[in-house]
Amino acid sequence: PADIEFAYEPLDDSFCLIQSRPCWCQTCEEEGIPDLGGKRVILKADRMVTPGVLHNIPCLVYIDHLQYYSNPDFFKVARGIGEINEQMKGQKFIFVSPGRVGSSNPELGVPVKYNELTNCCCIVELGIPRLGFMPELSYGTHFFSDLAVDSVLYMPVFEGESNNLIDQEWFTENEWEEGPHPAIRIYRGNFSAYMDGESNQGVIIDNGTSAEG
C-alpha cells in the first residue's frame, strides 16, 4: 500500500503528483488501550496514530512552545535535542514538540535532524494555535521511512479539539531538568504509550514521574 499526495488544477484539467510513500504496514505489538486504572493521561490523540505499545520509557523530552517561539535561536534548540540524544546512551525517550518536527522552516517546527533522534521511540507533534493560526503538522512525513524502519511511534495532538488532550497542568506542576536550551524540558520517570490503529486513538501515560536537579 502507498500514500499519494497530489494537486489538481480544474481550469487546466492538470494533475501533479507531489509525493508518494509506502504506508506503515509492518507487524508490531498492538494491545489497544487498556483500562488505565487511574493512571494519568498526559497526551491524547484521535487520528493518524502509529499502532503500537511502549512500556517503561524513562524519559520524556518536551519543547515548551512559548519559550521556543520567544527566542530566535531555533537551531540551537534542535542541536540541543541532538546533545540530549547523545547523552541517552541507548536509553529511549519520548519527544514532544510543537508544530512540524524536522521542518526546514523553524517557524513551523523544530528543525531537528533524524540523526539527532536515534534514541527516540515516539514522536508527538502538538498542534497549538499561534497568533491566530494553527500550523499544519507533518504527520511524521519528514522522517516517514526512518520511523517505519526503526519502529518509532507517532501521534499528533491538537490543543482544544475534542478527544485530544495536552495536560498543561502536568507539564507545569512536575519538576523537570532544563536542557541545553531554556525551551527544552527533560522529565524523568516511567511513561507508557498506547496507540490503537483500529480506533485511531493514542495516549501517553505517566506511571510515576520524578526529576533530578
Show which residues each predicted segment covers.
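Conserved divalent-metal-coordinating catalytic cores
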Residues: 1-213
